[in-house]
Regions:
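Short, functionally important structural connectors and interaction interfaces within domains
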Residues: 2, 24-27
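Glycine-rich beta-strand-turn "strand-cap" elements at beta-sheet edges
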Residues: 2, 39-46, 76-103
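Short, well-ordered beta-strand segments in beta-rich or mixed alpha/beta enzyme
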Residues: 2-9, 39-67, 92
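Short, surface-exposed ligand-recognition loops at beta-strand->loop->(often short) alpha-helix junctions
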Residues: 9-20
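Residue-level signal for secondary-structure boundary sites
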Residues: 16, 60-62, 97-99
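Conserved GNAT-fold acetyl-CoA-binding loop/helix
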Residues: 19, 23, 69-70
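An amphipathic, aromatic/His-enriched active-site/gating alpha helix that lines ligand/cofactor pockets
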Residues: 27-36, 55-90
């Protein structure tokens, strides 16, 4: 499994419209081969910042499959206008360490 991480800085005053657009965009990415899971979380300290976490089966499912698709073109149309600055996207391997509470 690969974890994609992106910090999304949304233009001030546009978070409500961004979240509405993201509700549509998430359906595009979730239909892609290799997609596993997505979380969009809003920052508590900076209400214009979000973290996007996407789990993929393989790196290529994101970098070639999704980014090379018509769905990605629509994703761009829906979301890219909200970002300032444009986000850096990074990919992470399986956990080196992991811990959680039982149950």
């Amino acid at each position: 499994m690969i974890l994609e991480l992106a910090i999304l800085d949304v233009r001030p005053g546009e978070t409500v419209v961004f979240e509405r657009a993201f509700a549509e965009a998430k359906l595009l990415i979730s239909a892609m081969p290799g997609f596993e899971h997505l979380e969009l979380r809003r920052c508590l300290e900076n209400s214009d910042r979000y973290v996007l976490l996407v789990t993929w089966q393989r790196l290529e499912d994101h970098t070639e499959g999704f980014r090379g698709s018509a769905e990605y073109e629509r994703w761009r149309e829906l979301l890219h206008r909200f970002y300032d600055p444009f986000p850096t996207v990074e990919h992470y391997a399986s956990p080196v360490a992991e811990l959680g509470r039982p149950g």
